[in-house]
Amino acid sequence: MADAAAPDAASVRNFTINFGPQHPAAHGVLRLVLELDGEVVERVDPHIGLLHRGTEKLIEQKTYLQAIPYFDRLDYVAPMNQEHAFCLAVEKLLGIAVPRRAQLIRVLYAEIGRILSHLLNVTTQAMDVGALTPPLWGFEEREKLMMFYERASGSRMHAAYFRVGGVHQDLPPKLVDDIDAWCDAFPAVVNDLDRLLSDNRIFKQRNVDIGVVTLDQAWSWGFSGVMVRGSGAAWDLRKSQPYECYAELDFEVPIGKNGDCYDRYHIRMEEMRQSVRIMKQCIAKLRAPHGQGPVVVDDHKIFPPRRGEMKRSMEALIHHFKLYTEGFHVPAGEVYVAVEAPKGEFGVYLVSDGSNKPYKCKIRAPGFAHLQAMDFLSRGHLLADVSAILGSLDIVFGEVDR
């Protein structure tokens, strides 16, 4: 009788559940369909597109200046890094050189964006596995950094501060002093986080040997950024293909050797320290005599004249009117420019037909390539490990769905 009641092995089906799209550990509007054999993950099927807005198509209907704010809304955790890629692409087509002071300001704010992103990721990754203190410490520092964003651009998140040919306006000396003071105090916060998490028994159990990816697998999946460096490759576009003034800055590229969640956490922690190092060098150069000067290219066919000049000169008024109605024309051609964004290689493939609007702007989002490997990374792990793996990928849906 007992044998008759026992289920036949062939009739036992795997259990399918939904993870998200309103899940607190989903890091946005992610829906994962998980196929489970007990607690073990057999298959992960990511469903994306819930935040799709047609960004690439919208950019085709805007002038080059109007397109910049769309890039803030991709990886909205570190907005200026995306603007950077687009501006570099347009500048390459125009064949213009950015003034040195503008380059230093761009690099300074790109590194602020990197710290903003890594702080959010490291602390929420800790929260995903049960540590509730780090997010409180991390958000306190992020608040200060977003104030620096606001003081430079007027906006905490969607800055639209970078311009083709430079940046919108110069930084006041008091702001540079405050950023310098913050750089002196911040390493102590990273050390506190390090002490709290790095040797914590529970944190290590949840991250060591979880979501392991070898270097060959990382390359074949199209990984970049921390995902590749965690597997042992010192591939950082700031070093391998330097842009702006990165070639003259002194910093290290941290790499891991195991390719697991724990290594990726350590790399992000060390990258925050290196970013502070870069910021200190930028501030020193901004204060030096050779760091003074204009913050935008001196060409009124690309960047509008000052308001005071516009009220005195008819030519300046015409330039201003033409730039804000028609915009500037970019020579026909195509270009691919990539920057080392906090999430990985953020690329812009820009095609111009010689008009005042992009013919095509293809965006290469690093998170998109990382998310496609979610099934590969999660198979054979327990259900509880899915949120740890997802946290270590550092996914933001603005750039994945665009």
Curated annotation (Swiss-Prot):
Q: Which residues form the signal peptide?
A: none
| UniProt catalytic activity | a quinone + NADH + 5 H(+)(in) = a quinol + NAD(+) + 4 H(+)(out)
The UniProt keyword set, sorted, is:
Cell inner membrane, Cell membrane, Membrane, NAD, Quinone, Translocase, Transport, Ubiquinone
Q: What is its EC class? A: translocase
Bilayer topology reads: Peripheral membrane protein
> Which positions, given as ranges, span the membrane?
none
UniProt-annotated location(s): Cell inner membrane
Give the E.C. number(s): 7.1.1.-
| Top-rank taxon, per record | Bacteria
Q: How does it assemble?
A: NDH-1 is composed of 14 different subunits. Subunits NuoB, C, D, E, F, and G constitute the peripheral sector of the complex.
- State the protein's purpose: NDH-1 shuttles electrons from NADH, via FMN and iron-sulfur (Fe-S) centers, to quinones in the respiratory chain. The immediate electron acceptor for the enzyme in this species is believed to be ubiquinone. Couples the redox reaction to proton translocation (for every two electrons transferred, four hydrogen ions are translocated across the cytoplasmic membrane), and thus conserves the redox energy in a proton gradient.
Entry protein name: NADH-quinone oxidoreductase subunit D
The organism encoding this protein is Rhodopseudomonas palustris (strain ATCC BAA-98 / CGA009)
Query: Gene encoding it?
Result: nuoD
